[in-house]
Amino acid sequence: METRAHPPGLQDVLQFPLVEALYGRRARRFSLGASIPDGPLEFTSRHEPIPLSDLEQMLVLTAAAGNTGWHYMITRHARYAPHLSNYSGAAGGRTFPSAAGFHTSEVFFTDDEGTYLFETRDAPALVDQTADGPPDLDAVLEAHRSRIRKLSESRLHIPAEEPYMEGHNSWCANRPGSTLLIPVGDLAQHMIAVLCFMVQNGYALYDDINGDQISGLERYSHLVNLEEPLPLSFMETYAITECTAELSTCCYAGMLMLQAMGLGGWMFDGIDRYTVLGASGDPEVPWLGFRYDTDERWPLPNPTGLEGVFEGYCPPYYPDMRAAVEAFADRKFGPGGPFHPDTPGPWKESTRVRSSAQVHSEEFKECVAIMAQYIYERFGKFPGTVPSIFVLTYLQAHHLELEFYDHHFGPGAYLKTHADHMSRWHPERCEG
C-alpha cells in the first residue's frame, strides 16, 4: 500500500501488533491542556490542546464504525431451509458486530470545528477485500470521508458539571482538542427486528407487565405459538442488551486504534444520555437536539429521533407501527438491502444467494405490526419499557499529556506509540 504524503506514524499503525493493543489498552484521560487542581494526582498541563488531524480523526472513525465489505449473513436455519436466513437489516458489515446483522446504530461525533454524523449503517461495500492483501487505505479513508455529514459549525456544548455529566468526568470529557464519538442506537428499529426474528422462529409476545394477551394474534396461530408466548419485558431487555453490545463494541474497536496511533482517550458512559440527545429539559443545553416526549406513564423522557437525520422507526416519524414495520421490511428487501437480488455481495453467485431469502409476506408483517402497535398504544411509545433512541457509551480521542504520566506514574504508563506520537505524526511540532 502506498502512503502518499502521510506521516510515518501511519506505517506504525499498519504494523502495530493486535496483542499489544489488547494488553496495552488503558483509559488515558489526561490530555494536553488539562488540569487536575488538587488531590494526590494534582497536575496542570503546560501545553495548549492540539486537535486531531484529519487523518487521525478518519482513522479513529473508520476503526470505530467503518464499513468492512459485505456482511456474510447467517447462512442456514432448518426451520426455513432451503431459504437463506433473512434476519439481517444491512448488506454491509462494519468493524463491530451487530446481532444477526441488524445494524441499527450510527455514530455522531463532535470536535472543535463542529458536530457531525458518520453514516455507515446502510453503506455498500466501501472496502475492496481481495486475496492479494489489505485494501488501499487512501481509497478506504476517502470513501468513508464522503459518509460524513456536518450538522453544525461548533462543538456540542455541555456544562462540565452534574447532572449533565458525572463529576469524575467534568475535568476531562469533551475538552478542547478532543474528538468525542457518540454512537446512537435506533432501539425502536432494533425491537422491530427482534419481533421479526420472533415470528420467523414461531414465537409470539404477551404483556407480562400488565398481564394481558395481545388481541388479534389468534389469526396468526399458524405462524406463532400462542400457547407459549414470550414476555414483553424479557424481549425488550433482549433488544436493549443487543443494542448495547453494538454501541459498546463500536467504541472498543476505536479504543484499540488509539493504542496503535499513540492517542490518549477512553470509552466511558459518564455523560448523561438524555442531555446528549437533547432531552435534559434545559433549553440552554440542546446538544444533538433530538425530539423527545414526556408522559405521566414514563419515569423519563423518551427521545424518538432527529428529523431528516436519524429518525426512529416509530411515531411521529411513521403514522403507526404498521408503517414502521413496512419501512423495516423495505430496508431488508428493497434496493440496496441484504436480500435484494441486485445488491452485490461476496459470493460467486450473489444474486442467487440474496434472492433465495424468503420475503416477508403481508400476513407476516401484519403479525409483527399487531404486536408492535399493541406496545405503542398500551405504553404510549415503542418500545414500551426502554427508550426509542438509545445512547450508552462514548469514545473520546485526544493528544496525551505525557508529562502528567511521567510525573505521577512509573515506567509503562503509556506505550511507545504514545511516546513517539508527536515525532511520528506531527514532526513539524518537534522542530527547533
Which residues does each predicted region cover?
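Acidic, surface-exposed loops and disordered segments
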Residues: 1-432
